[in-house]
């Protein structure tokens, strides 16, 4: 089974984004997920404006396996539970903060 995928949507100059990225980096080694950071403004300038259009007003946004998981902060308790579900084949919790 593949590792869960966490994407952090961010932008330059976002102090909250830096804090969330650091928190996710620590959790990734403990919980065993792969993490990628995507700057929505860079994505928009290179032909993918959809991320900025959809998520740009509430950064940082955490996506788990391509689905919105949380925004503005990491809901660590929920992320732990959803990573465990993802790892063992159950769908993640669909509630949003």
From Swiss-Prot:
It holds the Pfam family Glrx-like. One of its GO terms (cellular component) is plasma membrane. This is Uncharacterized protein Rv0508. It comes from Mycobacterium tuberculosis (strain ATCC 25618 / H37Rv).
